Amino acid sequence: MDQDAFFFERDPEAEGEAPRKQESLSDVIGLLDVVLSYKPTEIGEDRSWLHNIIDNPKENKSSCKSDDNNKDRAISTSTQDHRSSEESGISRRTGESKTETHARILDQQGIHRASRRGTSPNPLPENMGDERNTRIDEDSPNERRHQRSVPTDEDRKMAENSNKREEDQVEGFPEEVRGSTSLSDDGEGRTNNNGRSMETSSTHSTRITDVITNPSPELEEAVLQRKKRRPTTIKRNQTRSERTQNSELHKSTSGDSSNLEDHNTKTSQKIPPSKNEEPAVTQKNNHNHRKTKHTTNNANNNAKCLPTPEHDTTSNEEGTSNTSVDEMAKLLVSLGVMKSQHEFELSRRASHQFAKRMLKSANYKEMTFNLCGMLLSVEKSLGNKVEENRTLLKQIQEEIDSSRDLHKRFSEYQKEQNSLMMANLSTLHIITDRGGKTGDPSDTTRSPSVFTKGKDNKVKKTRFDPSMEALGGQEFKPDLIREDELREDIRNPVLEEHNNEPQASNASRLIPSTEKHTLHSLKLVIENSPLSRVEKKAYIKSLYKCRTNQEVKNVMELFEEDIDSLTN
């Protein structure tokens, strides 16, 4: 917190309370002394110098510019200020020793942080700005008014230790002067002193008690040498890398190598020194850090300078590679593998692609790589063709097996058909040879074996009638005789009445005879009776089923009783 700013904030209250002005000022000064000092043990000390600053801040300037009449007044004010400063000198020295030790500890911490973080491209204003912003609240009020003189012993030490600074810079340490803080920047000082641009020399940080405000010419020369050191080291590293490149590239001529060196030196001047890429270093591995730094610079320069000769060599070899590709395409066309050169250029097969790359390759390494790729692609394509042939052979074998089965079935079916054909031919031969007759083959009269459809003389069926027995026109057996044939064991006594011949044929019935007149006569009697049709059928059935004469007699008695009942 600034004294002037605090006082001007309290100014309207002081104007409103004019009689209590001195009391309010003393209270404000006491508060400032408590806040700004670390250990305010001497509060009851004389503060007349503070009263003089606040009441008439422009007194010193006006006394320097006044006339001879005002000289005594100016001398009196200066002596008062000097006495007050001498009286308060003891308290200031005690506070200064504490703040200086604390500032040096913080300075060492800042150096270690910078070494861990890596050196920045502009370390001086960064350290000054950060530390000034962090250390403003720790100021003591004595440092604003009374500025200390710069110690000369440290100037001599800094001039003597300029070579040590260069060593530190090579080893990766931050660019800071040993035993003191870095120099301040005018731009940041104006922004951070709360508008007091006229008082830039009066710094108010405890760390800047040892700052060199007026640097000697030796220090300036050392700083300039440090700033010019990095591009020279980069150039040395680049020249070394160029030598290694020129030793490795055997194909490049002397004129091309000189042009490449000029081009590389121009590009190296344009390349800014990269500080953030360098690794952070501690004090234990200084020697290793030098080696790693040198190798990283060489690697970066090689990465930046290598592509140009490779591009030139590839551009020179493209013409030769194209001619070789064309010759290969012509050879393939002449052998009959390809139809045209354009087809070889546009082919997407892996072996063709690797062949093109091998013909266009610039180094033996690329050539061997592409040759291996071509061989592997050819092997893979051959393996694929072998697998395809295996699958085709399997399919052909399956088709052959199925065709064999079909041939077997067809041959069996053909045998069956042949046997049937032979049988039919034999029957036809017999029919045509004999003429359809089963008699003697000596008969020459032949009848056709195939008959056309003609009108057949159908015999009309005539129902059995007992009157036809005398006529002899009975062709079919009557139902009664058929039923009796089914029961051969049971003999009807009526039928066997006058038939003593055991082997009488059915044809004997066609002859008119009187042997069986009893059965027929009884049937005729029953049919001519006035009974109903159902009763007639029942009596005829029962009559034919009789086994003995007594049964026939009983049936006829029942028939007579029925007729008597009807007539009566």
UniProtKB/Swiss-Prot annotation:
Region ranges (Multimerization): 344-411
Domain of life assignment: Viruses
Chain positions covered by the region annotation Interaction with the nucleocapsid (N-RNA): 479-568
Gene Ontology molecular function: RNA binding; RNA-directed RNA polymerase activity
Keyword annotations from UniProtKB, A to Z: Coiled coil, Phosphoprotein, Viral RNA replication
Ranges for region Disordered: 1-24, 45-324, 434-455, 493-513
Biased composition (Low complexity): 295-304
Region (N0 binding): 33-41
Residue ranges of the region described as L protein binding: 412-445
Start-end of Basic and acidic residues biased regions: 7-24, 56-105, 129-144, 151-167, 239-253
CDD domains for the chain: MEV_P-protein-C_like
InterPro entries, sorted: Paramyxo_PProtein_C, PProtein_oligomer_dom1, RNA_pol_Pprot-P_XD_paramyxovir
Coiled coil regions, renumbered to chain: 387-416
GO biological process: DNA-templated transcription; viral genome replication
Polar residues composition-biased segments: 179-216, 441-450
Quaternary structure and partners: Homotetramer. Interacts (via multimerization domain) with polymerase L; this interaction forms the polymerase complex. Interacts (via N-terminus) with N0; this interaction allows P to chaperon N0 before encapsidation and form the N-P complex. Interacts (via C-terminus) with N-RNA template; this interaction positions the polymerase on the template.
Entry remark concerning the domains of this protein: The N-terminus consists of a long intrinsically disordered tail. The central part contains the coiled-coil multimerization domain (PMD). Forms a four-stranded coiled coil structure. The C-terminus constitutes the alpha-helical domain that binds to the nucleocapsid (N-RNA complex).
Role played: Essential cofactor of the RNA polymerase L that plays a central role in the transcription and replication by forming the polymerase complex with RNA polymerase L and recruiting L to the genomic N-RNA template for RNA synthesis. Also plays a central role in the encapsidation of nascent RNA chains by forming the encapsidation complex with the nucleocapsid protein N (N-P complex). Acts as a chaperone for newly synthesized free N protein, so-called N0, allowing encapsidation of nascent RNA chains during replication.
Family designation: Belongs to the respirovirus P protein family.
Protein name (Swiss-Prot/TrEMBL): Phosphoprotein
Gene responsible for this protein: P/C
